[in-house]
Every structure is written in structure tokens, then in C-alpha cells.
From Swiss-Prot:
It holds the Pfam family Forkhead. GO terms for molecular function: chromatin binding; DNA-binding transcription factor activity, RNA polymerase II-specific; RNA polymerase II cis-regulatory region sequence-specific DNA binding. GO terms for cellular component: nucleus. Residues 74-168 bind DNA. This is Forkhead box C1-A. Residues 217-233, 284-296 have a biased composition (Polar residues). Keywords: DNA-binding, Nucleus, Transcription, Transcription regulation.
């Protein structure tokens, strides 16, 4: 076979088979010997092609028109799905048997043939499945056959609305049973909702304090709060302008303020959460006008920077110095000016001892004249004092102990109080107010003799005298 064709022939590679008419893969002399060769071997040769009958088709001949394969493929839907499609496609959600046939043949060309077979299956499925309900025809609409529709409980028999998969075979009794079970489960929940609503309406909730009521505290209105009998009978200490001393004052003076302040503080502490405690309530109360005579809650009066037990705040006026019944009430200053000593350097100089009382009195007086006559915000950290005459200083045995507590450092740092801005004392954080209320009410010991007994660590110096102008009161 290799000797019968030329290797040097350009057509031997099979690239261009139809270059010449007299040359082919096989020589003409041997043409008759290869009549039995298969067609793929002779399709490139004119001489070999002529030896075969004309009915032999070429490999690349044109195809005759054939029907598309997709038209003849059976749809992947069951007969139940086909009937459901026809019913849901109708405007009235009901269709006759002939309408089902027409819908299926229009949508799926596969069912255009062999009508007898699949139409019989459609009728069987309509009769045997409970999901299809037969509806009699009305007399007003003449025609042949009855309508078929879907049972209302069978609309969800296909998964996610896809007709390719059905959940399960629909049965009317199962559907009714499921409906009853759902009704039993939903009944308690429906009954519980109205009862809960009635309980909410019958039990009035505690309404929080409105911001409008808080902001108009300066004289028009005050936030609604329950007034306890103790708060309604708050004693008022006489003006310090008079020469009467604290110990010889009214029966509601310093010796009796400890029990009164603690009791009222406890009651106010329990009443505070009912008002809707908020930061706005704190700040607006701190910014209260001196012309209003409102009481401060223990969380506001608590001296957060000194660790002293918070006491009951008293009424005040611009012409009277705010004298708060703090346990530290034995210090004495003979002055006629309105003074409120803050938690700064010259306030600590009150405890230097009896030998320096004269010098300290003049220093504190000159410094406090620059301060306002009233200061609500600074009273949270103030050390209240009683205005006793200088002649009564020596009669108090506590001055020696106070001098030993404060290490006689107040004389050296007393002059620093004038340069310390009072405005920096007016901004206390909310955390300090809460901490002072918690620590002050529970941990600070108070002596019945009105002596200032503050719990400081004995191993650390009380005050720093290394030239620091700011004293960290919240350190302790």
C-alpha cells in the first residue's frame, strides 16, 4: 500500500486534496483494485468517488431539516403539576377539562402527539387526588363539562412554589388535622396577648422626670417627687452674722444634725431612683439659682473630694452663708463676710491648730471674698464650718488632734489658695458623685462629738508640699 502512491506528491500530506483532477491519493492503474475501500478513504479522490454509486453521501454534505430535540423531550413536571399550572393560569382559578388539555398542548409541544395516552392520565389524576375539587357549572354559563379548581389547603403542596418537587401527597384529613393543631397552638398565645395588654394598662409605670420640668427648676416648677415627712420639716440654722455660737444655737443645731442628716439621707437615697435619675437632673440641680430654696439630694451634697459623710443640705439665701451640717464642724473663723470653704489649700489651713488661728482667719477671709456668696456646685466638696468667735477657740480640745492630723502643713501652703482658680472646683465628674455617695455613706466613721474623723492611710503623708498647686482630693 505504501508502494502504490508517491511520497513526493504534494497531496500525500492531505492538506489540499482537490488541487488537480488527474492526480489523487491512488494511481489510476490501481483504481479498480480498491473498489472495496471504505468511504473515508475515497472521499478526497475524484476517480475513486466516481466508482461509487451516486446515492453515497459525502462526509460534509448538507443536513436535511430535522425537528428540534427540545420539542420532543418530555417535560420534567408531573401530571399533578401540569394540572395545577393550568388552574393557576386561569383568571378565575378554575378551568374545565378541555381547558387543561389546551393549556398543556400550548405550553409543551411534547403533548401534541399521543393525545389519547396523556389525556387519560390527566383525567385519572383529577379524580384520584384530593387536591383537585370539581365545581359544578353554573346555568348562566352554558358549556360542556364541570370546572376544576384547587383545594384552598393545597396551595403549599409544592416546595417553595416550584412545580418540580412536591412536599407530600395531599390528603384532606391530614390538612384538616394540621389546621386544628395550628389553631390549638395559636389559641393560648392569642389569649395571652390581651391579658398582657390589660396588665400593662392596669399597672401604671413610674414615669421618669421630664427634661422640661428639670430645666424650669429656678422658680417656675420643680420635678415631681415624693416629699417625705423628714424633708418637709428641715430645720434652718440661724445666720452666722449673729454673734451666737453654733453650740448654743437652736435645738436643731450641730449636735442633732448627725442623726437627722443620716436619716434623711437614707430616705432620699431610696426616693432618688423613682424620679428617673439622669445627668441632666444632676447638672440642673447644681446650676440652681440662689433665689430658689431647693434641697440637694445626698448624691449632690456628698463631699466627694474629702471622704466625709454626706449630710443634709439646708436652705440658704444670698444674704446668708451656706452652712452645711458636716461632721467637721469644730473649726472656727471669726469673720462677718459670707464664706464657703472649698476643697483647696486655704480650706485645709483651718486645721493647723490654735496657735495659727489668727493668721489663718485673715488669710481665709481675704481669699474667700473673691468667691461668690453662694456656690452650689462647690458644696459637694466643701468642708462646712461653724462661725465661732475667736474667744471660744481654746475651749475645744479637738484642735490639738486636728493639728497632728494635718502635720502643721497648712501654714506653709495657705498662701497658695489665692492663686488656685475657683472655677476648676466647679466641674466634678458624675463618677465622683456616685462614688462619694457609696463610700461616704458606708465607710466614713462619724463621731458623736462632732469631731472630724476621716479615714486616711497612716503610712502616707496627707498633703504634698513640693510646690504642687493642685491638690488631688479624690486620691483618698
Amino acid at each position: 500500500m505504501q508502494a502504490r502512491y508517491s511520497v513526493s506528491s504534494p497531496n500525500s500530506l492531505g492538506v489540499v486534496p482537490y488541487i488537480s483532477s488527474d492526480q489523487s491519493y491512488y494511481r489510476a492503474a490501481a483504481g479498480g483494485g480498491y473498489t472495496g475501500m471504505p468511504a473515508p478513504m475515497t472521499m478526497y479522490s475524484h476517480a475513486a468517488h466516481d466508482q461509487y454509486p451516486a446515492s453515497m453521501a459525502r462526509a460534509y454534505g448538507p443536513y436535511t431539516p430535522q425537528p428540534q430535540p427540545k420539542d420532543m423531550v418530555k417535560p420534567p413536571y408531573s401530571y399533578i403539576a401540569l394540572i395545577t399550572m393550568a388552574i393557576q393560569n386561569s383568571p378565575d382559578k378554575k378551568v374545565t377539562l378541555n381547558g387543561i388539555y389546551q393549556f398543556i398542548m400550548e405550553r409543551f409541544p411534547f403533548y401534541r402527539d399521543n393525545k389519547q395516552g396523556w389525556q387519560n392520565s390527566i383525567r385519572h389524576n383529577l379524580s384520584l387526588n384530593e387536591c383537585f375539587v370539581k365545581v359544578p357549572r353554573d346555568d348562566k354559563k352554558p358549556g360542556k363539562g364541570s370546572y376544576w379548581t384547587l383545594d384552598p389547603d393545597s396551595y403549599n403542596m409544592f416546595e417553595n412554589g416550584s412545580f418540580l418537587r412536591r412536599r407530600r401527597r395531599f390528603k384532606k384529613k391530614d390538612a384538616m388535622k394540621d389546621k386544628e393543631d395550628r389553631g390549638v397552638k395559636e389559641a393560648p398565645s392569642r389569649q395571652a396577648q390581651p391579658q398582657a395588654r390589660e396588665q400593662e394598662q392596669s399597672v401604671p409605670g413610674s414615669q421618669p422626670v421630664r427634661i422640661q420640668d428639670i430645666k424650669t427648676e429656678n422658680g417656675t416648677s420643680t420635678p415631681p417627687q415624693a416629699v417625705s415627712p423628714t424633708l418637709s420639716t428641715v430645720p434652718k440654722i440661724e445666720s452666722p452674722d449673729s454673734s451666737s455660737s453654733m453650740s448654743s444655737g437652736s435645738p436643731h443645731s450641730i449636735p442633732s444634725t448627725r442623726s437627722l442628716s443620716l436619716d434623711s439621707a437614707g430616705e432620699q437615697h431610696h426616693q432618688a431612683p423613682a424620679q428617673g435619675f439622669s445627668v441632666d437632673n444632676i447638672m440642673t440641680s447644681l446650676r440652681g439659682s440662689p433665689h430658689s430654696s431647693g434641697e440637694l439630694t445626698p448624691s449632690l451634697v456628698a463631699p466627694s473630694r474629702t471622704g466625709i459623710t454626706p449630710t443634709l443640705s439646708l436652705n440658704y439665701s444670698p444674704n446668708q452663708s451656706s452652712v452645711y451640717s458636716s461632721p467637721c464642724s469644730q473649726n472656727s473663723i471669726s469673720t462677718t463676710s459670707n464664706a464657703t470653704y472649698h476643697c483647696n489649700m486655704q480650706a485645709m489651713s483651718l486645721y493647723a491648730g490654735g496657735d495659727r488661728s489668727g493668721h489663718l482667719g485673715t488669710t481665709a477671709t481675704t481669699v474667700d471674698e473673691t468667691l461668690p456668696d453662694y456656690s452650689i456646685t462647690t458644696t459637694t466638696s466643701s468642708l462646712s464650718h461653724g462661725n465661732l468667735s475667736s474667744a471660744q477657740e481654746g475651749h475645744h480640745p479637738h484642735q490639738g488632734r486636728l493639728a497632728s492630723w494635718y502635720l502643721n502643713q497648712a501654714g506653709d501652703i495657705g498662701h497658695l489658695g489665692a492663686t488656685y482658680p475657683a472655677q476648676q472646683q466647679n466641674f466634678h465628674s458624675v463618677r465622683e458623685m456616685f462614688e462619694s455617695q457609696r463610700i461616704g455613706l458606708n465607710n466614713s466613721p462619724v463621731n458623736g462629738n462632732n469631731s472630724c474623723q476621716m479615714s486616711f492611710p497612716p503610712s502616707q503623708p496627707i498633703y504634698r508640699t513640693s510646690g504642687a498647686f493642685v491638690y488631688d482630693c479624690s486620691k483618698f
